[in-house]
UniProtKB/Swiss-Prot annotation:
Family of the protein in this entry: Belongs to the TRAFAC class dynamin-like GTPase superfamily. GB1/RHD3 GTPase family. RHD3 subfamily.
Role description: Probable GTP-binding protein that may be involved in cell development.
Protein name: Protein ROOT HAIR DEFECTIVE 3 homolog 2
Binding site for GTP: 47-54
Biased composition (Polar residues): 767-783, 823-834
Documented EC number(s): 3.6.5.-
GO molecular function, one term: GTP binding
InterPro entries: G_GB1_RHD3_dom, P-loop_NTPase, RHD3/Sey1, Sey1/RHD3-like_3HB
Residue intervals on the Lumenal side: 705-707
Amino acid sequence: MGENDDGCSTQLIDGNGEFNVKGLDNFVKKTKLSDCGLSYAVVAIMGPQSSGKSTLLNHLFKTSFREMDAFAGRSQTTKGIWMARCVGIEPFTIAMDLEGTDGRERGEDDTTFEKQSALFAIAVADIVLINMWCHDIGREQAANKPLLKTVFQVMLRLFSPRKTTLLFVIRDKTKTPIELLERALREDIQKIWDSVRKPEAHKNTPLNEFFNVMIVALSSYEEKEKQFEQEVAELRQRFFHSISPGGLAGDRRGVVPASGFSFSSQQIWKVIKENRDLDLPAHKVMVATVRCEEIANEKLRDLATNESWLELHEAAEGGLVPGFGKKLSSILEKYFSEYDAEAIYFDEGVRKEKRLQLKLNALDFVYPSYATMLGHLRSNALESFKIRLEQSLNQGEGFAKAVRDSQQSCLMVFDKGCEDAAVKQATWDASKIREKLCRDIDAHTFFARSAKLSELTANYEKRLTQALSEPVESLFEAGGKETWPSIRKLLKRETETAVTDFLDVVTGFELDHAKIDAMVQNLKNYSQSLVEKKAREEAAKILIRMKDRFSTVFSHDKDSMPRVWTGKEDIRAITKDARAEALSLLSVMTAIRLDERPDNIESTLFSSLMDGTVSAASSHNRSVGTSTDPLASSSWEEVPPNNILLTPVQCKSLWRQFKSETEYTVTQAISAQEAHKRNNNWLPPAWAIVLMIVLGFNEFMMLLKNPLYLLGFFVAFLLSKALWVQLDIPREFQHGAVAGVLSITSKFLPTVMNLLRKLAEEAQGKTTQEVPDLSASQTYRQQSPSHSISSTISESVASNISSAGDDAEYSSPSPALVRRRNTNNVQESEISQM
């Protein structure tokens, strides 16, 4: 018996009870049984050996099971269980040809396989044809009655109720009415059912709960072949749509889907052979579990290799994917739908359970991509928040409002992105990612607020530095009684202005009052510390400042003109005033006075250092042995220690150093004054003047008696005066007598020669007086009020004498040059006489 192209006849179980797994799989593959779902039926036939079972199946379903050759004798033809597809029957119907019972080949005692195959047929088939001879009805051992009894009993023990149609085919019917035969047969079957020992759960269960009993009679195939074929054809029609309501198996239960038929058959045969306790529903669940799990795993593998999924996954790794949720939902729905289509006929509970497991596994598989998308959304939203916040702040918007608006906008975009990325089949919650985004936004807000406040504070500190540093330094350099009041006023004004502006700006941050008050106080403390720092810096340079102050007062007069020590100045008084100014500056820099607290530092310093108290007290203390020096202390009365810049001891030491370093300046001034007196003393001693008057009385009288002598002396006086002015004799002698004589000697001869040449030219009338010369003459007369004589000779001399003090010129200079030199020399002469 082999396979043909139409029915694909295959041996399912061989005579030794070995299940042909490979053959069954080939059968399922060739016939495409797995595509049928629940739309298939299984028909099995059982009966005595050589009773025409294969012949009936071949005629009934157009199969090609091997039939017995009557001419070769009666022997076993079908060994084991064979199966084939029924040709031309809808729905898909499988015919199973079982090995005949009561065969001599197995013997009387070897009935195990008969019982196993019969039980297998009832457990697997929807319709079981029981082939029996008409004349065996009513016999106890015939008609498979013992076999049916055993099968019923074992089936109740191993399987739960499964509605099966038992179609008794009475062969070679006789003249006995079919009604009588049917009644007798039903009575026999009922007796068999009643005699079966049933489990407690089915003790009162009627036969029709498990079986549909039907009876049909056929004529003899050998004697009435045509009639037999006609009756078989009529019976064949009953197998069309056999599983539809009203069909032969219309009320069947516990049907295994076609895709699980192979596995189910294997497991049933395994249970029967091992005789393990198992009911049909459990078997059904087992088959559904295995098959649904296989389908689910297959769909999961297909999902993992799906090109659309791989492209979507790769795109999600690179960045945001618009429509991610819809695309992924579509991919998942495709495989979930395929699972539903393939597992629709399996046990509903198992199917749903495995579908849920498939769903969970599939969602777990794709979740990393979803999480990546949420990560991109979070990163983009955070970056967008940063950019939007910075833009809002640059546009001058308040910090708190900018944060709220930026956060609201970014969270809205994030929520929309989450909706776009949401997978329909999943219930994933993006709230944790959103919370993390909010935490990230809060963290960035905190750092941004801190940075902005630090920047704002730094700007206002810089502003205070610019507003206070130079003015405070200038006030300290001025160093007077109004120094600290001016500093306090400046500090208060600039601090209040900065605080007011700071409050206007910081209001946009919406900080609590305590925080704002602390920041304002820090700003005030900064301005005060800035002044204190400047004060300490200036205190460190106080000695230099004191010397500068002393030098300024000592070396300049009230009009800030440099002093010329002519011998008329009171150096002692000037020195005292200069030291008083320096000491006043020292008293200003001894302590920080920002709290307007009165002190006696200045009076103590003046009384101790200017009035000589220190030196006097020191002398007295050395004799008495006690200390009453007010500066012998490390602190000032009524001055906090942290406000002290210079201690009394330091002030005393600085004053000594100051006096020591300024004594040289005073000494130099005294020396310059004495030298000036010596250089400017032109008059002879008084005794010499008296002697000259006494001895020169006769000559004086002679001059009075002779006017020509007087005129000659007058001309000589004018010439001498001209030479005096041109040679600038007082200035020359400021550098010493020897140097003055040498300088005048070198200039005297050129000046005299130039003067004589001019006089000669005037006498000969070759030179004409010009307006600029008159102007020069007038300028000279104005600058020499002590000599206002309007003599022609004096004007000529004053306008034409050219100075040769520096370049020793012998040529006559131009009138303008002569006028300029005359003017300069007259001014220098006046300055030297101050």
